[in-house]
């Protein structure tokens, strides 16, 4: 990193952020695959399964590839053959992966330098465990949503044209050759379906081949989509606010990839923004799904919807489906967020009041934010993972049958504990208990299948030791967190507990 910083300091005297020559430096591709970028406390993120430097990635191959990319005969050949490029016998994806990995490291450099300089001013380096937990959003929901009236369930629009992505990057990097290469690279090796595709209805999936570059592009695109919120907050910042807070430091890829949290609470905008007068608004996003809640009327939320649709269409030059923004009242609406099914139901309550010798009942209504485990999507997720069938009946997992008994039980127990940890904030535990039951019985059937025995014989052989693997660890954690609580364990499990060490959504819960 010091070498890269020194190179950039020299380049700034010629042209700001002149990054193109770095594509031909050998150490760039070593950095792209080196574990040194992914040690604890690193500002970069890269999944461990794509780590490891491959000697086939070299700057010489990159130089030859870029030269052929700009040759007209190569372009003709590439359009005639979608699977093979100018290098005979090599797959096109090999070279696209090579360039994208090197380019991903290069485009991160200006952002990392900006982060390092800001950290030097603050004299502190953030650790991954200190990043804000995604579970911290739910206490915010519990505190705020019960006082609001309307909610907009928003799916960030797609697709966006490849040229728009280049223009977004151009706002951050003024290196023209690099931008030209990025534009050519997109149109030569990828179409939009390969770049960012909606694998599920509410979040974006990225290319598995080049996750680093596409995570960077996705975050740049989302920041641009949400720029209207930052603009509106700046317009109202001089006005009196009942509560206000922003967490814009999460917007960049290297600090927290999956979460960008913005909270807006203000009384009144200036007259030029008459459309949004008196919008007591809260906005939260995770991946491609966002929630916009307001204390205003349904008409106000329709105005917000119209404004968002028009802004996205005019700014990104594509049609944004209005159906991707769903507006509803809190009293009759449930929304999926971070694997939970959340709602704010109206609970009727009768209060007995007594004055002197007479007494009477007062009917009142209370609102409380409820978060439960969505059992039907969870069963679908467990079914895809081969723990049960589509009806929720547990089945054995034959791919694990070759493991030892202890390894099988340990794997199932770990999955069960992780789900219990993630869904500890559920207000109703029945769905969580059913998921545990499916995993326990699936584990028993897997071990019984391995020994060609029955589930009953397996349970009789292990007895309580088998259940301890699924329950005792959770009981120990709760006893450490709440040591002074004297409630029975079954009452303790009814309480909602939000763990602030969870920084990403559980894989089995990521079905929404």
Swiss-Prot record:
One CC-aspect GO term: chloroplast
Gene Ontology molecular function terms on file: RNA binding
Keyword Coiled coil: no
Keywords: Chloroplast, mRNA processing, Plastid, RNA-binding, tRNA processing
Primary localization class, coarse: plastid
Compartments, as annotated in UniProt: Plastid, Chloroplast
Protein's GO biological process: mRNA processing; RNA splicing; tRNA processing
Domain of life: Eukaryota
InterPro entries from the UniProt entry: Domain_X, Maturase_MatK, Maturase_MatK_N
Keyword Cell membrane recorded: no
Function description: Usually encoded in the trnK tRNA gene intron. Probably assists in splicing its own and other chloroplast group II introns.
Family: Belongs to the intron maturase 2 family. MatK subfamily.
Name under which the protein is recorded: Maturase K
Name of encoding gene: matK
């Amino acid at each position: 990193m010091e070498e890269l910083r020194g190179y950039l300091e020299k380049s700034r005297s010629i042209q700001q952020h002149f990054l193109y020559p770095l594509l031909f430096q050998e150490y760039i591709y070593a950095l792209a695959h080196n574990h040194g970028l992914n040690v604890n406390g690193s500002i970069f993120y890269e999944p461990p399964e794509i780590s490891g430097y491959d000697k086939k990635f070299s700057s010489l191959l990159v130089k030859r590839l870029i030269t052929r990319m700009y040759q007209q005969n190569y372009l003709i050949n590439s359009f005639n053959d979608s699977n093979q490029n100018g290098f005979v016998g090599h797959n096109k994806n090999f070279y696209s992966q090579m360039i994208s990995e090197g380019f991903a490291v290069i485009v991160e450099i200006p952002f990392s330098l900006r982060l390092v300089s800001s950290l030097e001013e603050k004299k502190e380096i953030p650790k991954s465990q200190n990043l804000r937990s995604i579970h911290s959003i739910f206490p915010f929901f519990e505190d705020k949503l019960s006082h609001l009236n309307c909610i907009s369930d928003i799916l960030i629009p797609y697709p966006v044209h490849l040229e728009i992505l280049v223009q977004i990057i151009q706002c951050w990097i003024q290196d023209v050759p690099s931008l030209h290469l990025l534009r050519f690279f997109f149109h030569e090796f990828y179409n939009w379906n390969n770049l960012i595709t909606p694998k599920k209805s509410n979040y974006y999936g990225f290319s598995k081949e080049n996750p680093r570059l596409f995570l960077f592009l996705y975050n740049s695109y989302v920041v641009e989509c949400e720029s209207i919120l930052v603009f509106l907050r700046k317009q109202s910042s001089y006005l009196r606010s009942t509560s206000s807070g922003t967490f814009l430091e999460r917007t960049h890829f290297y600090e927290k990839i999956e979460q960008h949290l913005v909270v807006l609470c203000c009384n009144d905008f200036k007259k030029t923004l008459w459309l949004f007068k008196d919008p007591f608004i809260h906005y939260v996003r995770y991946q491609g799904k966002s929630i916009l809640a307001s204390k205003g009327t349904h008409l106000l939320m329709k105005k917000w919807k119209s404004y968002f649709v028009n802004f996205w269409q005019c700014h990104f030059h594509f049609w944004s489906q209005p159906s991707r923004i769903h507006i509803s009242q809190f009293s009759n609406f449930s929304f999926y967020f971070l694997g939970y099914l959340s709602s704010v139901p109206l609970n009727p309550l009768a209060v007995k009041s007594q004055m002197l010798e007479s007494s009477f009942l007062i009917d009142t209504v209370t609102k409380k934010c409820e978060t439960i485990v969505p059992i039907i999507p969870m069963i679908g997720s467990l079914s895809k993972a081969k723990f049960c069938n589509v009806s929720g009946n547990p089945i054995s997992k034959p791919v694990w049958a070759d493991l030892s008994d202890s390894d099988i039980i340990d794997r199932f127990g770990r999955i069960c504990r992780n789900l219990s940890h993630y869904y500890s904030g559920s207000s109703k535990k029945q769905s969580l208990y059913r998921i545990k039951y499916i995993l326990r019985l699936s584990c028993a059937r897997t071990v019984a299948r391995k020994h060609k025995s029955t589930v009953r014989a397996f349970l009789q052989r292990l007895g309580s030791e088998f259940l301890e693997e699924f329950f005792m660890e959770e009981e120990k954690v709760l006893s450490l967190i709440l040591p002074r609580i004297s409630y029975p364990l079954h009452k303790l499990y009814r309480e909602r507990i939000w763990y602030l060490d969870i920084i990403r959504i559980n894989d089995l819960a990521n079905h929404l």
